[in-house]
């Protein structure tokens, strides 16, 4: 099949989760091909590697693309110490990364 660029979306922690003292930021990367993809997290512009869990779904039976999620897990205190959260996906379909981000103070 032809190469396909991922559709990338980012989600801040839910208010319910923050109430319980945790904070997970999730980045979804959907319907890309081939499977090789690189995901980078940045907090206030600095790359973050701790606390990241990547999970792939099985290859889609209809269109043979791949999807994955990348979850950045923090404590509520740590989450609230920073403002800018960014997920960067690097895939062969684009020379520059696909970047999705949000600012905590705008959620």
Swiss-Prot record:
Q: Which GO terms describe its biological process?
A: B cell differentiation
SMART domains noted in UniProt: IGc1 (SM00407)
Alphabetized InterPro entries for the sequence: Ig-like_dom, Ig-like_dom_sf, Ig-like_fold, Ig/MHC_CS, Ig_C1-set, Immune_Resp_Modulators
One GO cellular component term of this record is: plasma membrane
- Show the SUPFAM superfamilies listed in the entry: Immunoglobulin
- Lineage: superkingdom: Eukaryota
Q: List, alphabetically, the Gene3D superfamilies matched.
A: Immunoglobulins (2.60.40.10)
Q: List the disulfide bonds.
A: 27-87
Q: Which Pfam families match?
A: C1-set
Q: Which residues form the Ig-like domain?
A: 6-103
Keywords on this record?
Disulfide bond, Immunoglobulin domain
Write down the CDD domains for this protein, in alphabetical order: IgC1_L
Q: Which PANTHER family match?
A: TAPASIN
Instruction: Write the protein's name.
Output: Immunoglobulin kappa constant
What is the protein's species of origin?
Mus musculus (Mouse)
Taxonomy, top ranks, is: Eukaryota, Metazoa, Chordata, Craniata, Vertebrata
- Give the gene name: Igkc
């Amino acid at each position: 099949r032809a190469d396909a660029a991922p559709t990338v979306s980012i989600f801040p922690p839910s208010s319910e989760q923050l109430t319980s003292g945790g904070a997970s930021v999730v980045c979804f990367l959907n319907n890309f091909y081939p499977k090789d993809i690189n995901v980078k997290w940045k907090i206030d512009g600095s790359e973050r590697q701790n606390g990241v869990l990547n999970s792939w779904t099985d290859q889609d039976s209809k269109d043979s693309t791949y999807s994955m999620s990348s979850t950045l897990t923090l404590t509520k205190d740590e989450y609230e110490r920073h403002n800018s959260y960014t997920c960067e996906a690097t895939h062969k379909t684009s020379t520059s990364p696909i970047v999705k981000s949000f600012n905590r103070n705008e959620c």
